[in-house]
Curated annotation (Swiss-Prot):
Listed name of the protein: Target of rapamycin complex 1 subunit KOG1
InterPro entries noted in UniProt: ARM-like, ARM-type_fold, HEAT, Raptor, Raptor_N, WD40/YVTN_repeat-like_dom_sf, WD40_repeat_dom_sf, WD40_rpt
Domain of life: Eukaryota
Function as written in the Swiss-Prot or TrEMBL entry: Component of TORC1, which regulates multiple cellular processes to control cell growth in response to environmental signals. Nutrient limitation and environmental stress signals cause inactivation of TORC1. Active TORC1 positively controls ribosome biogenesis via control of rRNA, ribosomal protein and tRNA gene expression, and rRNA processing. TORC1 positively controls protein biosynthesis by regulation of mRNA stability, translation initiation factor activity, and high-affinity amino acid permeases that serve to provide amino acids for use by the translation machinery.
Native organism: Saccharomyces cerevisiae (strain ATCC 204508 / S288c) (Baker's yeast)
Membrane topology reported for the UniProt record: Peripheral membrane protein
Subcellular locations according to the entry: Cell membrane; Vacuole membrane
Listed GO CC annotations: cytoplasm; cytoplasmic stress granule; fungal-type vacuole membrane; mitochondrion; plasma membrane; TORC1 complex
Subunit annotation: The target of rapamycin complex 1 (TORC1) is composed of at least KOG1, LST8, TCO89 and either TOR1 (TORC1-A) or TOR2 (TORC1-B). Interacts with PIB2; following activation of PIB2 by glutamine or cysteine. TORC1 binds to and is inhibited by FKBP-rapamycin.
Chain's gene name: KOG1
Family statement: Belongs to the WD repeat RAPTOR family.
A biological process term (GO) from this entry: regulation of cell growth
Annotated WD repeat ranges: 1207-1248, 1252-1293, 1296-1346, 1350-1390, 1400-1440, 1452-1492, 1517-1557
Annotated segments matching region Disordered: 1084-1114
Amino acid sequence: MPEIYGPQPLKPLNTVMRHGFEEQYQSDQLLQSLANDFIFYFDDKRHKTNGNPIPEEDKQRDVNRYYQPITDWKIMKDRQKTVSAALLLCLNLGVDPPDVMKTHPCARVEAWVDPLNFQDSKKAIEQIGKNLQAQYETLSLRTRYKQSLDPCVEDVKRFCNSLRRTSKEDRILFHYNGHGVPKPTKSGEIWVFNRGYTQYIPVSLYDLQTWLGAPCIFVYDCNSAENILINFQKFVQKRIKDDEEGNHDVAAPSPTSAYQDCFQLASCTSDELLLMSPELPADLFSCCLTCPIEISIRIFLMQSPLKDSKYKIFFENSTSNQPFGDSKNSFKSKIPNVNIPGMLSDRRTPLGELNWIFTAITDTIAWTSLPRPLFKKLFRHDLMIAALFRNFLLAKRIMPWYNCHPVSDPELPDSITTHPMWKSWDLAMDEVLTKIVIDLKNAPPATALESQMILQQQETLQNGGSSKSNAQDTKAGSIQTQSRFAVANLSTMSLVNNPALQSRKSISLQSSQQQLQQQQQQQQQFTGFFEQNLTAFELWLKYASNVRHPPEQLPIVLQVLLSQVHRIRALVLLSRFLDLGPWAVYLSLSIGIFPYVLKLLQSPAPELKPILVFIWARIMSIDYKNTQSELIKEKGYMYFVTVLVPDWGVNGMSATNGSAMINSGNPLTMTASQNINGPSSRYYERQQGNRTSNLGHNNLPFYHSNDTTDEQKAMAVFVLASFVRNFPLGQKNCFSLELVNKLCFYIDNSEIPLLRQWCVILLGLLFADNPLNRFVCMNTGAVEILLKSLKDPVPEVRTASIFALKHFISGFQDAEVILRLQQEFEEQYQQLHSQLQHLQNQSHLQQQQSQQQQQHLEQQQMKIEKQIRHCQVMQNQLEVIDLRKLKRQEIGNLISILPLINDGSSLVRKELVVYFSHIVSRYSNFFIVVVFNDLLEEIKLLEKSDINTRNTSDKYSVSQGSIFYTVWKSLLILAEDPFLENKELSKQVIDYILLELSAHKELGGPFAVMEKFLLKRSSKAHQTGKFGFNSSQVQFVKSSLRSFSPNERVDNNAFKKEQQQHDPKISHPMRTSLAKLFQSLGFSESNSDSDTQSSNTSMKSHTSKKGPSGLYLLNGNNNIYPTAETPRFRKHTEPLQLPLNSSFLDYSREYFQEPQMKKQEADEPGSVEYNARLWRRNRNETIIQETQGEKKLSIYGNWSKKLISLNNKSQPKLMKFAQFEDQLITADDRSTITVFDWEKGKTLSKFSNGTPFGTKVTDLKLINEDDSALLLTGSSDGVIKIYRDYQDVDTFKIVSAWRGLTDMLLTPRSTGLLTEWLQIRGSLLTTGDVKVIRVWDAHTETVEVDIPAKTSSLITSLTADQLAGNIFVAGFADGSLRVYDRRLDPRDSMIRRWRAGNDKQGVWINNVHLQRGGYRELVSGATNGVVELWDIRSEDPVESFVDQNVTSQYGSQQKPTTMTCMQVHEHAPIIATGTKQIKIWTTSGDLLNSFKNSHNNGVTSTLAATGIPKSLSYSSTSDAFLSSMAFHPHRMMIAATNSHDSIVNIYKCEDERIDYF
């Protein structure tokens, strides 16, 4: 037997897909994309930030430690230098001081010289002085060293005074060795000799300060050295106190403040004596400071547990060839005899590599142990200070083993002694010594390489003044004198070209055999230190970088940049580190990375370009001001120009620069001939292979390619834009026709929006404040390219175009600028011409020069000739500049920009307001006249009682029709922009014009009279109870904007008082009067958005200042609830000033501060956002699967079971169920949005849409429902707003807002704005009481197409195919339906027209809906109750039925009722109609359920304010019509509400069948 569902068997349901849409389900590609592709809209950064940069306050708070700014990272060029050094040696060899009892044997070696090897003590101390000076010269050769050997007091005074006179204000090094005199006194006095060396004479520390002046660095190598340090500080404090009391020491050569900039290094504390171990030097402290590698090796071997086994070979011959004395002494067997081959300055040798490693390790220890300011002060300001303190760290580690504890001022922490990096230093020494042991045991007695190294050492050691007898003494200690630049060339300040290094490097390149040997040595690594630390750094980047703590390997990575072997790998890792955010960039800059990457810009190696461009983009993104002047030097900016224009200056410059770089000898340069297929290149390829494919725009390519991607070009353009920003010298050097043409090419042809955006910005910056560059760009067509980019599909590019064209606005000083440029180019031409003549003369005189020199001269000439031609071209351009032509172009630009006031992106419109502010500022006098005439015309209209009877022959003002009048009207439109920030900015521009008008000499008086007249008229209208907005005002507003708010809402007393404290428009009396003036004209000074922005937490109601008392309740409660906050927007509180400052450039450069090499947080597996998104996706799939079985239930179930009733507090006009959240969203006629949780029965949020009085919300849609949904509202004034986090009133924000329709007609029968959102295509269909259906593209935020409706009837309903998005259907007030296909030409897009409602007159379409799922039924419902199902392939309905129109009994008459609403379930074959009952139908026309939506709750709450008695209220509403209904998209649920009722009832279909078996 057939199954019975109702009172009779149901008609068969449709089982065929309608409209031929079955083809969509047969497309595997489409179904796969629907299942896997989740495209989210209005989710870009501009929607979350409103196009504003992060406020400085947030950066200072830095809650997430993302910035950690270090603003003083740059090492200034005028930093202090140690220019002179005093080496004061008080040894008195052969005589021990009386206060110290020395052991026997005891330490006696000074500066690696044993005095017992000399018969004459004078020669011994001279040799000690020479050696000590040579050791210091390894730290800094540029310092002038002077020795004072066993001096008397007079010599010391004369010596110190002379040094201060020659040093002026620079630093002096004072090294004091007091091994031959008593230890310093408790008061800090040091001892010297009298002239006869018969007495020890104390020298007051205060006198020493006076003689030496300041600043100084003091090294005390003596017993109880801390006594000097402590008393030095006391004397400095005494000088400061004396200065404060007015007793300045006039004998002091330096200001007292300079003494605070002194540094001190002392060998031991005040109660300690220096070590006396005979196996160690007596001046162990000085050895640690001046030759750390040698002393480290010796002490490492002496303390090694392997000295009797592995390292025994170093102790076997310790009794022979030792620098100190008699071989019979037993302690000599404890002293190792080791000679590390190589040179300190040559990092390719074992000794050089050890020195290099030591520099990296000590830098790391200091950087991780010291506060950042102290680290910078000690290690990044002075070469000598950095070297001494770096080596002092070694002293702090070694000397405590021998009961000496070095101290310093400033004091360094004791944690340095046990820092973990010292183990790395021990490991590095062990690796080198192990290889030496292997070579000594296995290698022949003397290899060719060793012989060459020995020869190099001997050549370096040879001095004219050294005797043959002393060669043996200095052999083991000769490491210290092998290179005078050892430590200096490894410091971060040593990147200048060193002549000695250059000469040695040029000699080494003379023969091809030596070059081959050099390359072989270059690849050889004696330790794995750097490679291991790079691996450690890579692991830190992979696993620990999210903690945002400084990695200890960063200083080591800095040192690795000096190595050509590991340079590319180090740069890649460094770029990955910089990609972590601004905090990483600041850290890198503070450690000293900048000089290195600046020097690398001179490298011609093509494989470095992508990495360097990326690194420089990161640096410029956080601090471009401190880098601009540096890029001028050596034309570093040209590196980025050649990335964009690879063939720039090929004939003239590249050959010259290339040869210069190859021969420069700088350790940071990399020649193009380098083997790029070496291990580093292969490593990077492995890195590329392991990296995921979607890393962002800044992926680094394989470096064997010379080409750069558009993303990398965008970074180069950004660097140039930052270089020329507010930097005229940079603009002058960077501007060239080649660059301009290439930028235009990229704007026209690149598919990467980022490149187009920054090319547009750079073009604008290149001609900013420069009429010559503007004229050149105009003549070359660059301006036309910018105008074309105003229609770019990407909002950021459109905004950039407005930003660039803003700089084309002429300045007041253009004529003076042209005159100055003429003078500059004339001077430049004369200089270049003289240089060219000099080169030509030089070429004629030197006929016998080499071919290379001849080529070099020719290249120089070609370069200068090219510069001369460029100079002549610019001079010619200056002569033909036509300022009037520039003005015409400027007006043309303005005309082209004006249509953007209707752009869908608030970012574009905000920049447009800024552009208008520049126009107003430049032509303020014109705008004063325009506004005055406009107000005058308005007063004339107000004087006419009937606008229709006014004299039509009245002439319009001369300002009407001008471009400035159009801009004024545009500003009025933008003053009512739906986006709050744009609105406030526009008001500032309008206020500025009115303030200028009020202060005008001639028009200020008449304007004041006009103001009084309007205010008086407004007050009279208020007293008579007339609403202050008449037809003449409508006429005034109509030409600019139809939806100006007619009322001015003010706050209650408490809120008004708060506003007066914060709002300058209220606190300024002139601005207050101007506000009243606008109120008198019917303009609202602020609409609901701005009124409630600051009162969201209190939710205080706003009342109307204007309007009669009868409208008070209606007007006052219009926006009682809070409005959404605008991201990163704060109201203007500063004095009004034009032009407005654009934040777009700072906002855009934040892109290069954000991580680009890794996935976004939401796409990273395991992240909170990823897990939340995955959970939502699984939940959505679960809901869809669970509700599939409910389709059958919808046919036989009971729909009249009420699930819950929700009180909206006002009558809901619109309702919308969320697909997957348990949310029901309602909107009433006062634009109040309410979000309910229907499962829990509570209100989640309640807020105002912020629409002006007289308008209401007419549509609700949800966007991105597959994830975190956004709420879209459409209001009757054509405004569309999109909200994020709408379910939480504390965090919800407005994402975007714009006018979907600009010519809406507000009539009593108008349905307002109707929308249809197509998630699959990102399209928003908008229509209403207009003659078009406008299609907005969410990707581009522009109008995609306007499709004519082909009728003058009002559109009442709109629906579209949600799967493909090509077909949409509109229902009209004349009862017709029209089908459109957007794939066709707009003129031919209407493909079908139907007449619904049985073709009766006076019937209009309530609703038309195309199912999202099911069999895609297209259902229409008319007001006469006719429900029809359509197939777009058919001209007639495929099914039709009529709601029986339940009649109402009034006496003996029966009147038919009207079907007020109709809804279709998205997936089930169910239709609901609403009259005074809810009826549930099948799509075949069978009635399943019929029930009333009646209740007793909520009625009186709605009508109590009207004063209607409760009995009458109930009787009038118990039989009320349904106001609105809404099906749940998936569940079998329906929400319904009655007219004049605040209660929303939700019904759920339930299975009530009884199973008897």
